Amino acid sequence: QPLRKLCILHRNPGRCYQKIPAFYYNQKKKQCEGFTWSGCGGNSNRFKTIEECRRTCIRK
């Protein structure tokens, strides 16, 4: 189980048109992965860095 409920949310790029590099926790693979966020919308499973994603969602 991930550390927080936000980590089980599916990747959601949002509904705008920017291309912003971001990271999310992939529940199936149990790891953080990169994706492109649109700049608005989406959900809480979105992080600026892979380190922030790992700190939030992966148990040590």
UniProtKB/Swiss-Prot annotation:
SMART domains tied to this protein: KU
UniProt entry tagged with the keyword Disulfide bond: yes
Disulfide bond positions: C7-C57, C16-C40, C32-C53
Domain spans labelled BPTI/Kunitz inhibitor: 7-57
Protein's cellular compartments: Secreted
GO cellular component: extracellular space
Site keyed Not important for inhibition of potassium channels: positions: K19
A molecular function (GO) term: serine-type endopeptidase inhibitor activity
Keyword Disulfide bond: yes
Site for Important for binding to potassium channels, residues: L9
Keywords, alphabetical: Disulfide bond, Ion channel impairing toxin, Neurotoxin, Potassium channel impairing toxin, Secreted, Toxin, Voltage-gated potassium channel impairing toxin
Annotated tissue distribution: Expressed by the venom gland.
Highest taxon of the lineage: Eukaryota
Residues annotated as site: May be the major determinant of the binding affinity for potassium channels: K5
A Pfam family recorded for this sequence: Kunitz_BPTI
Recorded family membership: Belongs to the venom Kunitz-type family.
Role played: Serine protease inhibitor homolog that blocks voltage-gated potassium channels (Kv1.1/KCNA1, Kv1.2/KCNA2, and Kv1.6/KCNA6) (IC(50)=0.13-50 nM).
Other notes: Negative results: does not inhibit serine proteases.
Name of this chain's protein: Kunitz-type serine protease inhibitor homolog dendrotoxin I
Organism: Dendroaspis polylepis polylepis
Top-level taxonomy: Eukaryota, Metazoa, Chordata, Craniata, Vertebrata
